[in-house]
Each structure stands twice: as structure tokens, then as C-alpha cells.
């Protein structure tokens, strides 16, 4: 039981021919984006295809685009069945940030096992890529708190991250600027942080 992809849409994705122009790429990414919550790291996988659709880009289909195209198709064909969210079980939010993107997995603990509710990801802007690792990790946490707010607000949940420097935020006396606003957002939620080793 849970939420699954529509077999007809997945078949349409799996049979999609290699794009021959920007319009084809946009159409494919648009259809694939409909199921982005089923694909871990969707934004990072799709980034080469998105780059082809920018106004400043020339359409030249290369190996990196073919790999991204095939990886997205494979990810959608093998997409997991997601658990239906409820407020009866504890949520776990795993976040991570790399140099180019951030991602999250929202899970629910059901019968002692974590079951995926949804995946989410986002490519960093040019400015955000210049942030230090701690700031990128904090941005990921805040972004996905907002993204999954309808599930997390009002519930106690666990946030797992691999960046232990984030523990400073709870002890920060008077944060200012951007970090202060992010921390203010986080204070709306009831959570504990766990660190992956």
C-alpha cells in the first residue's frame, strides 16, 4: 500500500526518444518532473538537461545529456512505492548538500522501519554554490523544512545530516542576517538533530 507512479506515464517516459531539440528536452523534463518526488537526487540528475534549455545555451546533445536522460528514465521506471504520510508515525528527514545541489529524503517510521514518503532536491544557484559547507548544509535543512512543512509542522521529528557543525545553530545567542532568518524558520519546528557518521 502506498503511492505509486502511473504505469502509463512511466511507460511514456521509458519509450521517450532521444530529444532532438530544446522543445523535446523541455517536454521530457516536464513529464519526468511530475514524478520528481519518487526520484532521489532528481535535480542533480536532471541538471545537464536543464542546462540545455537555458536561453544562453546552444542545443548540442552530448554524452552527459545522454547519461542524464537514461538515468532519469531508469529512475522513473524503477521508482519505489512511497508510503502514504500520516501524523500517527514519527518522521525522519535526511538532508545533504553537495557542491552543486541539495537533497532530502522524508521517511516515516512504520513498524520499526523507515519507509520513504518523498524525495526532494534542488540545484544551488550560482551564489549559493559559493557558500561554505556549513551554510550549504543549513540551507538544505531550511529548504526542506519549508518543502515538507505540511507534514512536519506540529510533529516531533528527527533531522539527520552528515555535517556536525550544524549543532552550533541551537546555541547561537543572537544570530543575524540570513543565518538568523534561517534559524528563526527552524525554530517553528519541533525536531532533534542526529548526525550520520
Roles of regions detected by a PLM:
Residues 12, 28-31, 51-52, 75, ...:
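Alpha-helical recognition domains of nuclear gene-regulatory proteins
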Residues 46, 90, 101-105:
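Short glycine-rich loop/turn motifs
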